[in-house]
């Protein structure tokens, strides 16, 4: 790995790792104590010394490619770039991956079932006796599968569309573990991988082209004052910036708006995936079994479905995906998931077992209609930042990685003839070189996507997800999807559209609905939300600025605007107990919003589902957030 010479960077990385390590070693209680740190954001009375410290020049580094996000797409991009560089270039390209989690994979959530094709493409020389170039302990071949419609206590078999067939083809994994392995492969080929580094902003030049990124300042108190641990964020200047943040990334959100990348496309629509990993009794374990379910517990007007995957040594992943375009503000995706586990189809597997992990994450469901323009001046979008998930397959890892390979090939062709950065020692000379070089706008990547297997795959299934949003709801969607998948294969002259309202705007007033009475958790099969959050390992320093923003951080005013209409929908769509409405006699509506930011597991649902689109998720300090395992 190439070493940085900048002392500020080295010191900052060490302090970030040290701070997070102290938390892990002490086993700090992170979820049972609600934090009030987001109630008010006080204006700090800064001294001149503190002002000078907060505004000191940032350390700067120059790289060829800066990749924000160390998930499957980001790491695939990085690995392919260095493979090309090592085989056909100088071998000296600086490819840097910045990941906000303290460890690679620590904030990765997926089902997951992998298709092996893209792995063989990325690692063509890797020998494997299991059919996919992964360590055999990380992958379990699907040997049996079911598709069921749940109704009452029944589980009714349903014909499987061809794109959903996994048996004998695909592999059950913990994507959390797989990403850790990918990180090792990236370092082997010379990628610089830096976990625990949060990226807060893009760098723009005078022509509004992206020239790199800025990492977040660390060690600032919730009042805005620098603490003893303060470290100024730094700048990474790059010839090409790759946004691989996953679904609904904060920098991606900036780029989409600034460059109008959704022009001529539909808005994105999302789902919320919630999952647990269980150790089950040997008699309930069926290694290689994968099942998907429709129907119960969701009503006809809510899109979604459940799954259970048996993998590894006695482990079962159980989960539910709920489409976030639901209209009823009383729906709680978390409680729907807990309810689902009591259906006999799931409970008979989980009884006598032990839940060992919990996770939740928003995912893209818009498909081809919602894929934005992929390139902008100085950068590109890859993976879930763009939204390549194949919804009928319930898979996005293979398309995310494939997009990374396409991006890497386009980037390499555009920069392979440029001066080698490592041969320019003077920092001023590097700056001058970057100023002179023309901005790279990779139209070739957009073109490559339209000719790729990703486009073909998404085109074929483009009408399936929006068919569930029609007047006939879930039943109509199932009928259309069956015809489209089994007979038409997407070869129709029309493309269905989603509702013009986004997932937040589509919420209807609570007055149109009755409150939903969910069963209380039994503590055996189903759990209260704080017990689940305690299984995520999430952590945020209580004394840091709140990363969840509402207008003016005015919790009373927020409640005035939201609570009378939607009756606390924020407390129901969040799968981590972050948002509460608590009594407040001074409030005109008798309540105020309370944000328990320490519980946040970075699922991004609040930034998507807030009905007035007035909750903004900002990146917290590097290393903060969940510390997932087996997810």
UniProtKB/Swiss-Prot annotation:
- Name the record gives this protein: Probable electron transfer flavoprotein-ubiquinone oxidoreductase, mitochondrial
Report the family membership: Belongs to the ETF-QO/FixC family.
A single Gene Ontology MF term assigned here is: 4 iron, 4 sulfur cluster binding
Enzyme Commission (EC) number: 1.5.5.1
Q: Which domain of life is it from?
A: Eukaryota
User: Keywords for this entry?
Assistant: 4Fe-4S, Electron transport, FAD, Flavoprotein, Iron, Iron-sulfur, Membrane, Metal-binding, Mitochondrion, Mitochondrion inner membrane, Oxidoreductase, Transit peptide, Transport, Ubiquinone
Any one GO BP annotation for this protein: electron transport chain
Q: Where does [4Fe-4S] cluster bind?
A: 574, 600, 603, 606
Q: Which residues cross the membrane?
A: none
- Swiss-Prot/TrEMBL cofactor(s): [4Fe-4S] cluster; FAD
Q: Which reaction does it catalyse?
A: a ubiquinone + reduced [electron-transfer flavoprotein] = a ubiquinol + oxidized [electron-transfer flavoprotein] + H(+)
Query: What Gene3D superfamilies does this protein's entry cite?
Result: 3.30.70.20, 3.30.9.90, FAD/NAD(P)-binding domain
GO-annotated cellular components: mitochondrial inner membrane; mitochondrion
Localization per Swiss-Prot or TrEMBL: Mitochondrion inner membrane
One Pfam family, please name it: FAD_oxidored
Per UniProt, residues of the 4Fe-4S ferredoxin-type domain are 591-620
Q: What happens when the gene is disrupted?
A: Displays higher growth rate and higher sensitivity to superoxide and heat stress, on nonfermentable carbon sources. Leads to decreased intracellular oxidation upon heat shock.
**Which EC main class describes this enzyme?**
oxidoreductase
- Quote the cofactor binding remark: Binds 1 [4Fe-4S] cluster.
What SUPFAM superfamilies has UniProt attached to this entry? 4Fe-4S ferredoxins (SSF54862), FAD-linked reductases, C-terminal domain (SSF54373), FAD/NAD(P)-binding domain (SSF51905)
User: Any idea what job this protein has?
Assistant: Accepts electrons from ETF and reduces ubiquinone.
* Note in the entry: Present with 3320 molecules/cell in log phase SD medium.
């Amino acid at each position: 790995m190439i070493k940085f010479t900048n002392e500020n960077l080295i010191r900052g990385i060490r302090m970030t790792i040290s701070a997070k390590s102290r938390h892990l070693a002490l086993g700090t209680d992170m979820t049972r104590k609600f934090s009030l740190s987001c109630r008010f954001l006080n204006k700090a009375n800064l001294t001149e010394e503190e002002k000078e410290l907060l505004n000191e020049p940032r350390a700067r580094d120059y790289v060829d490619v800066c990749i924000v996000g160390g998930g499957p797409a980001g790491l695939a991009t990085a690995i392919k770039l260095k493979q090309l560089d090592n085989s056909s270039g100088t071998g000296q390209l600086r490819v840097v991956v910045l990941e906000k989690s303290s460890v690679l994979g620590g904030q990765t959530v997926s089902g997951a079932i992998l298709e092996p094709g893209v792995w063989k493409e990325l690692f063509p020389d890797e020998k494997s006796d299991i059919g996919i170039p992964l360590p055999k302990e990380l992958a379990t071949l699907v040997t049996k599968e079911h598709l069921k419609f749940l109704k009452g206590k029944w589980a009714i078999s349903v014909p499987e569309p061809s794109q959903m067939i996994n048996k004998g083809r695909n592999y059950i994994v913990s994507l959390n573990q797989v990403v850790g392995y990918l990180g090792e492969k990236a370092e082997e080929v010379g990628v610089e991988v830096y976990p625990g580094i949060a990226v807060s902003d893009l760098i723009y030049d005078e022509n509004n082209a992206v020239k790199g990124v800025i990492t977040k300042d660390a060690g600032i108190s919730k009042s805005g004052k620098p603490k003893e641990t303060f470290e100024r964020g730094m700048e990474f200047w790059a010839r090409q910036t790759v946004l691989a943040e996953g679904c609904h990334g904060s920098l991606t959100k900036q780029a989409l708006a600034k460059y109008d990348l959704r022009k001529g496309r539909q808005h994105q629509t999302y789902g919320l995936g919630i999952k647990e990993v269980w150790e089950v009794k040997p008699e309930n374990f069926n290694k290689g079994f994968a099942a998907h379910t429709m129907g119960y517990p969701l009503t006809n007007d809510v899109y979604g479905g459940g799954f259970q995957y048996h993998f590894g040594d006695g482990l079962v992943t159980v989960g539910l995906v709920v489409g976030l375009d639901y209209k009823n503000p009383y729906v709680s995706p978390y409680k729907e998931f807990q309810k689902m586990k009591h259906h006999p189809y799931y409970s008979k597997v989980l009884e006598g077992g032990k839940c060992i992990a919990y996770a939740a994450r928003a995912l893209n469901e818009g498909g081809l209609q919602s894929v934005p323009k992929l390139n902008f001046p100085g950068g590109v979008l890859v993976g879930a930042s763009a939204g390549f998930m194949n919804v009928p397959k319930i898979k996005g890892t293979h398309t995310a990685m494939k997009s990374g390979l396409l991006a890497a090939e386009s980037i390499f062709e555009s920069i392979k003839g440029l001066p080698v950065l490592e041969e320019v020692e003077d920092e001023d000379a590097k700056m001058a070189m970057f100023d002179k070089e023309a901005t790279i706008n990779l139209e070739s990547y957009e073109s490559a996507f339209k000719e790729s297997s990703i486009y073909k795959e998404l085109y074929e299934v483009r009408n399936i997800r929006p068919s569930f949003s029609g007047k006939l709801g879930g039943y109509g969607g199932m009928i259309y999807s069956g015809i489209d998948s089994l007979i038409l294969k997407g070869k129709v002259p029309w493309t269905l559209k989603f509702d013009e309202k986004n997932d937040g705007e589509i919420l209807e007033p609570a007055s149109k609905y009755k409150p939903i009475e969910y069963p209380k958790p039994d503590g055996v099969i189903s759990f209260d939300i704080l017990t689940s959050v305690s299984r995520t390992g999430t952590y945020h320093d209580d004394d840091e600025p709140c990363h969840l923003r509402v207008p003016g951080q005015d919790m009373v005013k927020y409640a005035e605007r939201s609570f009378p209409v939607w009756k606390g929908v924020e407390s129901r769509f969040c799968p981590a107990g972050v948002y509460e409405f608590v009594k407040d006699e001074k409030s005109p509506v008798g309540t105020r919003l309370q944000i328990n930011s320490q519980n946040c597991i970075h699922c991004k649902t609040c930034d998507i589902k807030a009905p007035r689109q007035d909750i903004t998720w900002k990146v917290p300090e590097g290393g903060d957030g969940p510390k997932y395992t087996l997810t």
